[in-house]
From Swiss-Prot:
Pathway(s) of this molecule: Porphyrin-containing compound metabolism; protoporphyrin-IX biosynthesis; 5-aminolevulinate from L-glutamyl-tRNA(Glu): step 2/2
Record gene name: hemL
InterPro entries reported for this sequence: 4pyrrol_synth_GluAld_NH2Trfase (IPR004639), Aminotrans_3 (IPR005814), Aminotrans_3_PPA_site (IPR049704), PyrdxlP-dep_Trfase (IPR015424), PyrdxlP-dep_Trfase_major (IPR015421), PyrdxlP-dep_Trfase_small (IPR015422)
UniProt KW keywords: Cytoplasm, Isomerase, Porphyrin biosynthesis, Pyridoxal phosphate
Tagged with keyword Coiled coil: no
Positions carrying N6-(pyridoxal phosphate)lysine: 268
CDD domains: OAT_like
Top-level class of the enzyme under EC nomenclature: isomerase
Natural source organism: Serratia proteamaculans (strain 568)
Enzyme Commission number(s) of this protein: 5.4.3.8
Biological classification of the source: Bacteria, Pseudomonadati, Pseudomonadota, Gammaproteobacteria, Enterobacterales
Record note on quaternary structure: Homodimer.
Annotated protein name in UniProt: Glutamate-1-semialdehyde 2,1-aminomutase
Predominant location: cytoplasm
Length: 429
């Protein structure tokens, strides 16, 4: 009998009523093969599937669970808020408190607008940048993903990479023509775009750490160079911190790498596990947003009281002294241990990591710093490694193009168990 018989049954059932059996493509395990695990519950650093098996979790709901699963402060905040009502469609005090906390923690954000997802945040920020500058074109980077808005699904990164589709059908060429795709970590490609369209580019949008082609940090000159080019040509710099915000550092990767954006997009951790996104930045730019300005954006559930309570509780905990030091130390321990184990078993491996993010690349290269480097990695070897680790009770992202995430709920014993499991798996590759 299969070890995952209930997951297999549920997956077959789901495929009859949900496209592909999942509500987000990467969950289908298309990137690694096999049947996706159906999860019954989660606690701390662990997931528990419907067949009763426990896994050390390095997906963390794709980033939000920086405190670990089912954190009592967040759980209690949600229960308390739910007792007062689920949605009002009107302003609340918690929205104000949440906005004040976000702008306090991320100093480049003078003002912030709450939305319901990272996609909404990036889509709205780009509309705002276009409206503020009165320009149409945007620059994004090959292999970077900023949600599934039409103008951004151009050489988009993980979602598309996992499925082997660099572009999505259904995106008209007329939409995509205003999206200029440059090479991550290559300032020359950005200079060329600005030289070709010096007065037409509204903004650059960038993941400060590219977490949707696994985990690729910026080269030292890259983010400052983008800031300088935006200043030179009158474009806005949008830093997409949906993944890195409150994880790489308390004030995000922009703080870690010392770069000042005009607009910042947030998601994942900001909701503590609830569906929350946000975008914000310079006061004069945000003033162009409705109802004070002409750029329209709205949402029935934006600022939802349950989501705001969860987010406020999460950010309050994340901002405690020592959280990010612990997160970094645990990630460093995992990265060093995996590299050592791989070396012992003669497996060529590169591990990129920053803050509470990490990426594993099966490659003979000495480093991975670009989309081209990522595409040279051994995806088939990753697939085998993923399933071997799953059998060992370790849940990694089911795609060679997705970052891994640490939480402060992971213990050093969890990390050591993971390293020991990886050593056994490396020996079988």
């Amino acid at each position: 009998m299969s070890l995952h018989s209930k997951s297999e049954s549920l997956y077959a059932q789901a495929k009859q009523v949900i496209p592909g059996g999942v509500n987000s493509p990467v969950r289908a395990f298309n990137g690694v093969g096999g049947v996706p695990l159906f999860i019954e519950r989660a606690d701390g650093a662990y997931l528990f599937d419907v067949d009763g098996k426990a896994y050390i979790d390095y997906v963390g709901s794709w980033g939000p669970m920086v405190l670990g699963h089912n954190h009592p402060a967040i759980r209690n905040a949600v229960i308390e808020a739910a007792q007062r009502g689920l949605s009002f469609g009107a302003p609340t005090e918690m929205e104000v408190k949440m906005a004040e906390l976000v702008t306090e923690l991320v100093p480049t954000m003078d003002m912030v607008r709450m939305v319901n997802s990272g996609t909404e945040a990036t889509m709205s920020a780009i509309r705002l940048a276009r409206g503020y500058t009165n320009r149409d074109k945007i620059i994004k980077f090959e292999g970077c993903y900023h949600g599934h808005a039409d103008c951004l699904l151009v050489k988009a990164g993980s979602g598309a990479l996992t499925l082997g589709q660099p572009n999505s059908p259904g995106v008209p060429a007329d939409f995509a023509k205003h999206t200029l795709t440059c090479t991550f970590n290559d300032l020359d490609s950005v200079r060329t775009a600005f030289e070709q369209y010096p007065s037409e580019i509204a903004c650059i949008i960038v993941e400060p750490v590219a977490g949707n082609m696994n985990c690729v940090p910026p080269l030292p000159e890259f983010l400052p160079g983008l800031r300088a080019l935006c200043d030179k040509y009158g474009a806005l710099l949008i830093i997409d911190e949906v993944m890195t915000g409150f994880r790489v550092a308390l004030a995000g990767a922009q703080s870690y790498y010392d770069v000042v954006p005009d607009l910042t997009c947030l998601g994942k951790i900001i909701g503590g596990g609830m569906p929350v996104g946000a975008f914000g930045g310079r006061r004069e730019v945000m003033a162009a947003l409705a109802p004070t300005g002409p750029v329209y954006q709205a949402g029935t559930l934006s600022g939802n009281p349950i989501a705001m309570a969860a987010g406020f509780a999460c950010l309050t905990e994340v901002s405690q002294v020592g959280v990010h030091q612990t997160l970094t130390e645990l990630t460093d321990m995992l990265a060093a241990g995996l590299l050592h184990a791989a070396k012992e078993e003669n497996v060529a491996l590169v591990v990129n990591h920053v803050g509470g993010m990490f990426g594993l690349f099966f490659t003979d290269a000495l480093s991975v710093t670009s989309y081209q480097d990522v595409m040279q990695c051994d995806v088939e070897r990753f697939k085998r490694f993923f399933h071997l680790m799953l059998e060992e009770g370790v849940y990694l992202a089911p795609s060679a193009f997705e970052a891994g995430f640490m939480s402060i709920a992971h213990s050093k014993e969890d990390i050591q168990r993971t390293i020991d499991a990886a050593r056994r798996c490396f020996a079988k590759l």
